[in-house]
Structure formats: structure tokens, C-alpha cells
Design a protein with these regions (language model features):
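Amphipathic, Lys/Arg- and hydrophobic-enriched alpha-helical face
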Residues: 9, 40-58, 74-75, 91, ...
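Arg/Lys-rich amphipathic alpha helix in sigma70-family domain 2
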Residues: 74-78, 92-113, 134
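Structural recognition of an alpha-helix C-terminal capping motif at a helix-to-coil junction
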Residues: 49, 63-70, 84-96, 182
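Intrinsic, short, N-terminal disordered tails of RNA polymerase sigma-factor systems
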Residues: 1-30, 38, 114-154, 158, ...
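Residues within the DNA-recognition helix of helix-turn-helix
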Residues: 43, 64, 183-190
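Sigma70-family region 2
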Residues: 29-30, 53-57, 67-83, 104-105
Length: 197
């Protein structure tokens, strides 16, 4: 849920956080270990939550966290703030790496116990992220989700909650890729509007 929230929220606090992240990344590019630790403290839980949501396996999610932060360290100097927020970049790295790992592991079936344990952790992480929002914002978001047309809500849920790529969503729904992308984009716009009310 938090990834969806990140896509629709644009508060002053979010702007301040983006600026702090950009400053940290500039320091990391100069080899500042303290800045790296600060960025890790701010985002490791978020990166882990997304990886766990996609992979449904704690150890694999931890591996992704390490890989993402190693990549952040190595590529900090190449980051371009004009292309988006640091957190969005890190979540994109996380999602890509987790989906790659998931595809590589698809041949190995998961046990019901593994899936159940992972769902519990994901539910807890989502609940903690919702605590960051006001009760009114949560209500608006939930109402906005319910008011989405079924086709938009389904495409959005598959992309954000199940970690599917747009191509995979299109295949699962037997819809053209362009249609799926439009539905997801329209759903995010409607949720932003619902939160702004």
C-alpha cells in the first residue's frame, strides 16, 4: 500500500523528505558513509517491505535490500534529481531486482507456511505505513479505491500489490499494454484527487 501512497501523496513533508534524500545522495557520491547510513535508516524498511511484498520471502527480501543499497552507493554520482525523487528511484531499483529474482525462482514452489508468514509481515508493514497518514487521508484513500472503476482498480492492484509489470498485468487481463498503462495512470490520478479533497 505504501508504494501506492508514495505515488499519490505530494505533501510538504514529502517535499522536505525528497530534499533531504537528494542532499544525502550528493554526500554519498562524495563517499560520505554517515550520509549513506542516514539514507539507509530512512528507506531500508520501505525497500524491504516492497521486496517482501513481491517475493513473499524474508531472506530474499533482505538480499534485495543489500543489493539496492549497494547499487545506490555505486551509482549515487549518476543520480539525476530531474528524473524523480531518490525514494522513487530506490523503489524502482527494488521492484526491478525483486521481479528479476521472482522470475528466476518461479520454478521453486512456495510452501503455504512461507506465504502465510510473509503475508503477516506485509500486513504489519502496510498497517505501520498507514499510521503515517491521518485518519482522514486513509478514509479518502480507501473511498477513492472503492470508487475506481473495476478495470482501473484491478490493473492498479495487480501492479502495486502483486508487483506485476505492466506487461504481466496486460497478459493476465488479456488487455492491450497501452490500455493497462492508461488505466493505472488514470487510477493514480483519481486517487491523488481523492486525497486532495
Amino acid at each position: 500500500m505504501w508504494m501506492l501512497l508514495a505515488a499519490v501523496l505530494g505533501s510538504p513533508a514529502a517535499l522536505e523528505s525528497r530534499q533531504a534524500d537528494q542532499a544525502s545522495l550528493a554526500r554519498i557520491a562524495r563517499g560520505d558513509h554517515a550520509a549513506f547510513a542516514e539514507l539507509y535508516d530512512r528507506h531500508a524498511r520501505l525497500v524491504y517491505s516492497l521486496a517482501l511484498r513481491i517475493l513473499q520471502h524474508g531472506a530474499d527480501a533482505e538480499d534485495i535490500v543489500q543489493e539496492v543499497f549497494a547499487q545506490v552507493w555505486a551509482q549515487a554520482a549518476r543520480y539525476d534529481p530531474a528524473r524523480g525523487a531518490v525514494a522513487a528511484w530506490m523503489l524502482t531499483l527494488t521492484r526491478s531486482r525483486a521481479i528479476d529474482k521472482l522470475r528466476a525462482k518461479r520454478a521453486r514452489p512456495e510452501t503455504a507456511a512461507d506465504a502465510s508468514a510473509a503475508e503477516s509481515v506485509v500486513d504489519l508493514a502496510a498497517a505501520q505505513d498507514l499510521e503515517l497518514l491521518s485518519a482522514e487521508q486513509v478514509t479518502r484513500l480507501q473511498r477513492g479505491l472503492k470508487e475506481l472503476p473495476d478495470a482501473q482498480r484491478t490493473a492498479l492492484e495487480l501492479a502495486y500489490y502483486e508487483g506485476l509489470t505492466h506487461v504481466e498485468v496486460a497478459a493476465r487481463l488479456a488487455e492491450p499494454l497501452g490500455t493497462v498503462k492508461t488505466r493505472i495512470r488514470q487510477a493514480v490520478i483519481k486517487l491523488r484527487e481523492a486525497l486532495a479533497e
